[in-house]
Amino acid sequence: MSHRDTLFSAPIARLGDWTFDERVAEVFPDMIQRSVPGYSNIISMIGMLAERFVQPGTQVYDLGCSLGAATLSVRRNIHHDNCKIIAIDNSPAMIERCRRHIDAYKAPTPVDVIEGDIRNIAIENASMVVLNFTLQFLEPSERQALLDKIYQGLNPGGALVLSEKFSFEDAKVGELLFNMHHDFKRANGYSELEISQKRSMLENVMLTDSVETHKARLHQAGFEHSELWFQCFNFGSLVALKAEDAA
């Protein structure tokens, strides 16, 4: 059962950097619904994309799976035999709860839930890879290497779903969407103190890129096609496709 997020409702004397610890994992479903505009839509549509792209006898990777929402959405929409989902996260608290969530919903497609570093996992025989609000937590210097590895591990015709919080090259637009996101959080019951304290904890950990930067990286990795398919304020998701005739 998810609890309401009140982690930052009282002043915290020493704000450290953000971590996905036990306290965050406990309230994560409530936190993300009230903090990330369009999150439910992205999760449900990841399942729709899975129905289009997952092929028999292949693997799906959910890199940075948190509590397994994207994994479950994918699994509900796989209608082929001999598929497997590999869900990985480096937070022990998230992985523990993810395993519970996966086990609670029975389905034919097996899921390997792994506690580990997404930078170290091999990507093989993949028809789909999901990076759902994960890349932004890697050091910028490490992002291209991960995308390169994903491209190499995708089968021809495979898809990468990349959801992120965005920065904007147009400062005026960036300011507007930043403020609208804060309005969204206020409308969902977060106080100015909660918004401010969470932002302070995230600012050194979550480093955002522009859509243009994401597209440039995807192109460099080898993806022939990439486009923004969903956006709400400064959050959104891209899909990148490996050509069917790729070597």
UniProtKB/Swiss-Prot annotation:
Enzyme class: transferase
Gene3D superfamilies linked: Vaccinia Virus protein VP39
Reactions catalysed according to its record: prephenate + S-adenosyl-L-methionine = carboxy-S-adenosyl-L-methionine + 3-phenylpyruvate + H2O
EC number from the UniProt entry: 2.1.3.-
Top-level lineage group: Bacteria
Matches recorded under InterPro entries: CmoA, Methyltransf_25, SAM-dependent_MTases_sf
Coiled coil feature spans: none
GO molecular function, one term: S-adenosyl-L-methionine binding
Protein residues bound to S-adenosyl-L-methionine: 39, 64-66, 89-90, 117-118, 132, 199
Keyword annotations from UniProtKB, A to Z: S-adenosyl-L-methionine, Transferase
Single GO BP term: tRNA wobble uridine modification
Assembly description: Homodimer.
Function per UniProt: Catalyzes the conversion of S-adenosyl-L-methionine (SAM) to carboxy-S-adenosyl-L-methionine (Cx-SAM).
Family note: Belongs to the class I-like SAM-binding methyltransferase superfamily. Cx-SAM synthase family.
NCBIfam families to which the protein is assigned, alphabetical: carboxy-S-adenosyl-L-methionine synthase CmoA (TIGR00740), PRK15451.1 (NF011995)
Protein's UniProt name: Carboxy-S-adenosyl-L-methionine synthase
Lineage, opening ranks: Bacteria, Pseudomonadati, Pseudomonadota, Gammaproteobacteria, Enterobacterales
Gene responsible for this protein: cmoA
